[in-house]
Regions:
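Short, well-ordered alpha-helical microsegments
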Residues: 159, 222-223, 382-384, 414, ...
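Thiamine diphosphate
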Residues: 1-147, 296, 302-526, 531, ...
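Conserved acidic/glycine
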Residues: 1-34, 152, 156, 160, ...
Length: 670
């Protein structure tokens, strides 16, 4: 155990670096990080288990930072752990720097998650804790007995998602989850008591958490709380640390600058910065240094970790020798190796809803993927993720032998939990709900895309054909919104998301195949509620992997190209019959993913939709869904308003999604 004097000096060292980093960057958030320095110091110098030589070691503890604006605190402690250089700390918030304003996932550097909008980071931790429990149930505590730590701020507690994360973690009895709440009672614009007076401890206790309240700047209290939390066998633990915003900060006149909103989101500045560095024992002329005794303490910890890891790896080797099948699973699951699926042998019921086809595939995945977890936001029997559930069983408190998570009515929480599972590694995560409720998931979808995580988002009830439920439940603009992610490039230069809306049950099988093969970005799968006619006999469904392909009229002698995605394709097929009777020749193109189509060679794109061709597009969403493909030489029939409450076949007639209207629109266009 390190002395209190040394631990306090280490925390002050982190505070000095924090203030200096923000000052040099001329922007940032020093106050919260200065207050949280004591906890992060105790955690990394005495508790967090990781492998100094192999940051990807699957048995490591994981730390999830929720308030990403407190990044200087994390970068500083990771620099003490040899993950960053001092020069890199000096480049906080600069172009090309590995120290961006909010941390971005980088396992090699010890960054377990990208910290985005408040509330998401600690929910990732819940997902990681679930993944760890799931894997422990299959592989054993010898290799999966690690701890998930999270750090949350006042803002994260206020975000609505904390309700879902707190409820789920408590219900499932995630005793491998320890969360520190940095309760400094200050936020960017106000004190917390100007917007809330709830009893946070009682709230988490009501959710089933163990709650420990301490002085969050007292290293002895932090150590004792972490020790108690580690010993907890039944519940997740929340450590409420009452901390001092801007601890150690001084104003230009030398008076205390602590507990002040002014330290939250701006450099301390001028004489306030100088006085603060002096007060903390730093050198104003050279603040970017490690105190020798502090660096020695962290070096000693790294050596301790090498011994701990060596012991655990020896135990793992003995476990592997005794459990070769489990050892192979561990290797396969964390390397991303997947089982062989005979996709061509999957039989689908003809002319069925594509959500039903998805259920068929999910059942096969449940039987063949030992490391897949599926979830639904209280809609499994409607979004048909119950195809997976029927082959396994749901998690229950303390029991993770199943592979299905009933997330409850909490779409954003569910999405972030799945992100946390993906970040943990070793598992494949999928989650489902109605497409219209993807609106609740957009912040998480964006973060999954930014982090390049292969979460599978399953959305059923894809269009106005939800029918009687009315416009509140009928997607209109949602497809356009989600498909925008196909147009945004991630930092690897690829489309940040794959979005697939299959035209029939067989395309749905191929869509799932593409989703499972896609291990570099999230995938959105959009399925119908209603029956959809099969595409014409002879359709080469494997061409789904090109994003768009010809399903009828492939010869060059045509008058117009008809294109659509999803159930509108079958409407085009019926419309083409009327056009044919009138002597108009058509080519029909199914476009499950424009983003995927745009990545194909130009020659292929031109062969499917030649420049200058007359093109008619049909979409149950906004016309913009197809305008990029149709171009100025064509026309798109789509929705211009919200939907209506009526049987879906009535809506087809009223809104113009019929063969007759396809005929009329094409005739008028030609």
């Amino acid at each position: 155990m390190n002395s209190k004097q040394l631990m306090n000096k280490a925390a002050d060292n982190i505070r000095i670096l924090t203030a200096a980093m923000v000052e040099k960057a001329k922007s940032g958030h020093p106050g919260g990080a200065m207050g949280g320095a004591d906890f992060i110091n105790v955690l990394y110098s005495e508790f967090l288990i990781h492998d100094p030589e192999n940051p990807l070691w699957e048995g490591r503890d994981r730390f999830f930072l929720d308030p990403g604006h407190m990044s200087p605190m994390l970068y500083s402690v990771l620099a003490l752990s040899d993950k960053y250089t001092m020069d890199e700390l000096k480049q906080l918030r600069q172009w090309g720097s590995p120290t961006p304003g909010h941390p971005e996932v980088n396992f090699a550097r010890g960054i377990e998650n990208t910290s985005g909008p408040l509330g998401q980071g600690h929910t990732y931790a819940v997902g990681a804790a679930i993944a760890a429990k799931f894997l422990e149930a299959r592989l054993g505590s010898e290799v999966m007995g690690h701890t998930i730590y999270a750090f949350i701020s006042d803002g994260g507690v206020q975000e609505e998602i904390s309700q879902g994360a707190g409820r789920l973690a408590g219900y499932l009895k995630l005793n491998n989850l320890i969360m520190f709440y940095d309760a400094n009672q200050i936020q960017l614009s106000t004190r917390c008591d100007e917007v809330m007076f709830e009893d946070t401890a009682k709230k988490y206790e009501a959710w089933g958490w163990k709650v420990i309240t301490i002085d969050g700047n007292d290293c002895d209290a932090i150590r004792a709380a972490l020790t108690e939390a580690k010993a907890e066998q039944e519940r997740p633990t929340l450590i409420i640390g009452n901390t001092v915003m801007g601890k150690g900060a001084r104003r230009a006149d030398g008076s205390s600058y602590e507990f002040d909103c002014g330290t939250h989101g701006a450099p301390l500045g001028g004489d306030a910065y100088i006085n603060t560095i002096k007060n903390l024992g730093g050198d104003v002329e050279n603040p970017f240094v490690f105190f020798p005794e502090v660096k020695e303490m962290y070096d000693n910890r790294l050596n301790e970790l090498r011994t701990i890891v060596a012991e655990r790896k020896a135990a793992k080797a003995a476990w592997a020798a005794a459990n070769p099948e489990k050892a192979q699973k561990l290797e396969d699951w964390f390397s991303g190796k997947q089982p062989e699926i005979d996709w061509d042998s999957i039989e689908q019921k003809a002319d069925a809803p594509t959500r039903n086809a998805s259920a068929t595939v999910l059942g096969i995945l449940a039987e063949n993927y030992g490391n897949m977890i599926c979830s639904s936001a209280d809609l499994s029997n409607s979004d048909k993720t119950d195809g997976f559930l029927k082959k396994t069983h749901a998690f229950t408190p303390g029991d993770f032998s199943g592979a299905f998570l009933h997330a409850g009515v909490s779409e954003l929480t569910m999405a972030c939990v799945c992100i946390g599972m993906a970040l943990h590694g070793g598992v494949i995560a999928a989650c489902g709900t109605f497409f219209v409720f993807s609106d609740y998931m957009k912040p998480a979808i964006r973060m999954a895309a930014l982090m390049e995580l292969p979460v599978k988002f399953v959305w059923s009830h894809d269009a106005f054909r939800v029918g009687e439920d009315g416009p509140t439940h009928e997607p209109v603009e949602q497809e356009a919104q989600v498909r925008l992610m196909e147009k945004v490039k991630n930092h690897s230069g690829k489309n940040s998301m794959l979005v697939l809306r299959p035209a029939d049950v067989n395309e749905a099988t191929q869509a799932w195949k593409l989703a499972m093969e896609n291990d570099t970005t999230p995938t959105g799968l959009i399925f119908s509620r209603q029956n959809v006619n099969n595409l014409p006999e002879g359709t080469d469904y494997e061409q789904t992997n090109k994003g768009a392909y010809i399903i009828a009229g492939s010869d060059e002698d045509y008058d117009v190209i008809l294109l659509a995605s999803g159930s509108e394709v079958s409407t085009l097929v019926d419309g083409a019959k009327l056009l044919k009777a009138d002597g108009i020749k058509t080519r029909i193109v199914s476009v499950p993913s424009e983003g995927l189509f745009r990545t194909q060679p130009k020659e292929y794109q031109e062969s499917v939709i030649p420049a200058g061709a007359k093109v008619f597009g049909l979409t149950a969403g906004l016309p913009v869904n197809l305008e990029g493909l149709v171009g100025s030489n064509g026309k798109v029939w789509g929705l211009q308003s919200f939907g209506f409450s009526a049987p879906y076949k009535v809506l087809d007639e009223k809104l113009g999604f019929t063969a007759e209207n396809v005929y009329n629109q094409v005739k008028s266009m030609l």
